[in-house]
Amino acid sequence: MEGFTLAYWEVKEGAILPEHSHENEQSSQVTEGKFELTIDGHTQVYGPGEIATVPANTVHSGKALTDCKITDVFSPARPEYSND
């Protein structure tokens, strides 16, 4: 499939996602644990089953409040995450 990238992360409690942005729209679903995500200055805690959407070119950051499992979908695809 083309047009998007699917990524799976196992994140340890206390891990920090530094503030950044990218040209890709991003949807993130927490499947286990609690993750604090700040999108464009607005902070929310996400738990299992909850989904956050980060618009393209929007500054965001985060922190794992517990050990977490997170699935991300990026569109357009991120070639730097390719297995090719």
Each PLM stretch: what is its role?
Residues 1-18, 73:
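A short glycine-rich, His/Asp/Glu-containing loop-to-beta-strand
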Residues 56-80:
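Ligand-binding loop in jelly-roll beta-barrel domains
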Residues 27, 34-36, 43, 59, ...:
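Structural motif
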